[in-house]
UniProtKB/Swiss-Prot annotation:
Residues 1-61 are annotated as: Disordered. It comes from Arabidopsis thaliana. The lineage of its organism: Eukaryota, Viridiplantae, Streptophyta, Embryophyta, Tracheophyta. One of its GO terms (cellular component) is cytosolic large ribosomal subunit. Belongs to the eukaryotic ribosomal protein eL29 family. The modification Phosphoserine is found at S58. This is Large ribosomal subunit protein eL29z. Pfam families: Ribosomal_L29e (PF01779). Keywords: Phosphoprotein, Ribonucleoprotein, Ribosomal protein. Residues 15-31 have a biased composition (Basic residues). One of its GO terms (biological process) is translation. The gene is RPL29A.
Length: 61
């Protein structure tokens, strides 16, 4: 008996492109569940101190 074929990529690209390969929908707030906690902590501090130059100028005067 002949050996059977183990794998082929024939027609897979055509099947994938039939309905188009779409990028995932980008949401306003991407979920952070399962992300690195150290990165998330740093991101929180970065967001807290991300202030534009002219925003707090009127409050100081």
């Amino acid at each position: 008996m002949a050996k059977s074929k183990n794998h082929t990529a024939h027609n897979q690209s055509a099947k994938a492109h039939k309905n188009g390969i779409k990028k995932p929908r980008r949401h306003r707030h991407t979920p952070t569940r399962g992300m690195d906690p150290k990165f998330l902590r740093n991101q929180r501090y970065a967001r807290k101190h991300n202030v534009k130059a002219g925003e707090n100028a009127s409050a100081e005067e």
